């Protein structure tokens, strides 16, 4: 069991609450991340405030950074102890994005990173820069590029 911040459907500051979340061990192609930081950007503000409120209950926050604490059996790219940051469009690693709206964006179309632990496929992560804090790394994928 871990904790998460939730946003009720439609958004709005009065619809944010702290709750519990069950988490299993990562699947064969996933890693488990202990999140240490998240950065706030306009997209998060718009979702939480209700400007772009979600159609169903959602864990907000599009960006996160933390440490790999468990690794699925098929994962070769990452290891326990690696510092990582999430990506705004999971699975988009290079080339032109194959994205339709915000359906795959954490904190909007899928649950985001306002939580303690998360299991993710490696295509949703990148190694954080050496010598950067989790707080600095959390700003890279959205806030750092806008």
Say what each PLM segment does.
Residues 89-146:
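NAD(P)H dinucleotide-binding glycine-rich loop of Rossmann-like/cofactor-binding domains
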Residues 23-38, 48-93, 109-112, 129-131:
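Glycine-rich beta-strand-centered segment in the early N-terminal region that forms part
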């Amino acid at each position: 069991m871990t904790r998460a911040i939730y946003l009720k459907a439609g958004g709005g500051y009065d619809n944010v609450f702290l709750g519990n979340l069950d988490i299993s061990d990562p699947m064969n192609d996933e890693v488990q991340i202990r999140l240490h930081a998240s950065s706030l950007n306009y997209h998060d503000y718009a979702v939480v405030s209700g400007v772009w409120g979600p159609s169903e209950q959602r864990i907000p926050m599009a960006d996160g950074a933390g440490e790999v604490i468990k690794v699925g059996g098929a994962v070769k790219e990452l290891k326990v102890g690696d510092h990582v940051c999430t990506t705004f469009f999971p699975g988009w690693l290079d080339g032109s994005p194959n994205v339709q709206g915000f359906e795959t964006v954490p904190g909007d179309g899928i649950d985001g990173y306002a939580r303690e632990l998360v299991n993710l496929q490696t295509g949703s992560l990148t190694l954080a820069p050496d010598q950067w804090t989790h707080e600095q790394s959390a700003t890279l994928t959205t806030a750092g590029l806008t």
